[in-house]
Amino acid sequence: DLGAKLALNLRAGDCISLIGDLGAGKTTLSRGLIQALMGADTEVPSPTYTIVQTYETDPAPIWHFDLYRIESPNELIELGFEDAEDDIMVIEWPENAGSLLPSQRLIVELIFTDNGRSARLTGTTPEWKQRLNDIFDRS
């Protein structure tokens, strides 16, 4: 499970941006990631209407954002978006964050294919690229 693999390698200050069409699996991936750290019984609702849900995990709290309904990045300031940067951020619809989106992040693009779905992972820093190599070399 991709979410679980990523979860076990997260650190405070990490940002994961999830890109994909409606129904591509962004919330499902987020749920798998959070449940890998908190237990399979943990309820992980989509934050579509609340915009953000937080979870106390080790190594750091996770802020799960769904920015689908955000009309302006300024709305994020009121929600504590910048406060989350020292913790772990998982962001659905990251394009709606504008310039507030951290530049150092892991981009996970979920794509519909003839056989279901696939994921393209891109690290924006050398550290993320190395971590991805480590994660998938062990798999």
Could you describe each region identified by the protein language model?
Residues 1-5:
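N-terminal pre-Walker A segment at the start of P-loop NTPase domains
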Residues 7-13:
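Phosphate-binding P-loop
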Residues 16-18:
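Hydrophobic anchor at the beta1->P-loop junction of P-loop NTPases
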Residues 22:
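The conserved Walker
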Residues 26:
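Conserved lysine of the Walker
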Residues 40-55:
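Short beta-strand-centered segment that lines the nucleotide-binding/catalytic pocket of NTP-utilizing
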Residues 72, 79-139:
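Short phosphate-coordinating micro-motif centered on Lys-Gly-acidic
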